[in-house]
Every structure is written in structure tokens, then in C-alpha cells.
Amino acid sequence: MTRFSDEDRERIRGELVEAGRELFTRHGFERTRIKDVTEAVDIGTSTFYQFFDSKEMLYVAVLKRERDRLIERVDAAVAAAATPREEVRTMLETLFDEVRSDPLISRLIVENELQALLDQLSESERESLAADPPGEPLGYADRWVEEPSFRFDDPDLVRDAVTSLVFTTRSQELVREPGTATEPARVDRALIDTIVDGLFVDAAGEAAAE
């Protein structure tokens, strides 16, 4: 068995994850073979198993990296917003853009492939992943619900609602007839406007009602 330095191990593992990302994006999980990945990285199959126990474990690594990158992008976008209302709008715009442009993000959020894969892993494989806990998705929902103008007080409800919205915007592409549907970006804007307005109490309107 070939022995690698720590630097080489880090490099090869990164190359495997990147090659896996490209192949899984292009062909999907089922049609991608370990041989395809090892040929892309120019290593033998036996070397692959020094880094990952199975194709499933490689796919988990790919999806986890995509998840972490998504969280970083959303966090950066939200951090640049000036108000909670702008934070929600920016978060939704970023999520919608990512789901439409990145098939792996769509599979991660809409199809929940990461959790489905984790459920299929052996106990020892799941234990090996326990040392790398996931980032907190939509953690700012905990802060939003503390805002007096925010309509809901349950952050889990907010997170689940956002996931449902992302599913809705992705699924509309699957059911619409070509040439008859509204431009997706226009639909997204209308949906985001409606959601943002619905999540926050209109202080002026409430004052008038009183």
C-alpha cells in the first residue's frame, strides 16, 4: 500500500472530492463509478479506498462541502444586509439563485440527498463522520424571531418554511410547459416580495388600526 505524506493526502483527497463533484453533477450518483473518479485523478482503485470507504462516502463528502459553501455564501450575503427585512430578502434571493444554478445544491436541499445517504451508511461510517458536525443552516432565524416586527416566534418553523419555498421554486420548473410559463426570475421576485411582506408586521398599518 502506497504511503503518502500528510500534504499529499490532503491534496489527493481534495482532488477526489473535486472530481467527484464534477462527475456527480454531470452524471448523477448512480451513473458515476469509482473508476471514473480514479481515472480523473490518475490514481488506482486501491488508492481510492485509502481515502474513502465507498462511493457513498465520497458523495457525502461532496455534498457536505457544497452545503458548507452554500452556508458561507448565504451568511456573507445576509451579513451585508442592513435590516432583518433585507436579511430575509437577501437570504431567499441567494438560496433561489444557488438552487437554480447548481444541481448539487438542488439535490442537497430539494431532494435531501445528504440525509438519504447518511441513512444508508453503516454505523462505523456514520461514526467516522461524527467528528465533522454540520454547520447551522439558517441560524439567523433564531435572531429574526426575536424582532418585534417579525410575525413568528418559532425559528424551526421559519427554517422549514424556507426549505418548502426553495422546493416550490425548483419544482415549478418540472411542471411548467415550455413556452407558456412566466420567466423564473420574475416568479422568484414576486414570491420573495410576498414572503418578505408576510413575515413582517407593518408597523404603520398596525398603528392605523389601533
Each language-model region and where it sits:
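Short amphipathic alpha-helical elements of helix-turn-helix/winged-helix folds
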Residues: 18-23, 94, 98, 165
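N-terminal intrinsically disordered/low-complexity leader segments
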Residues: 1-11, 204-210
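Hydrophobic/aromatic-rich alpha-helical bundle segments in the mid-to-C-terminal region
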Residues: 106-107, 145-192, 204-210
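Generic hydrophobic, amphipathic alpha-helix propensity
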Residues: 12-20, 37, 62-66, 70, ...
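Helix-turn-helix
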Residues: 15, 23-57, 61
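Amphipathic alpha-helical segments used for helix-helix packing
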Residues: 86-90, 99-123, 171-175
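Amphipathic alpha-helical packing segments from all-alpha helical-bundle domains
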Residues: 68-71, 119-149, 156-160
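Hydrophobic alpha-helical connector segments
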Residues: 57, 61, 72-105, 158-162, ...
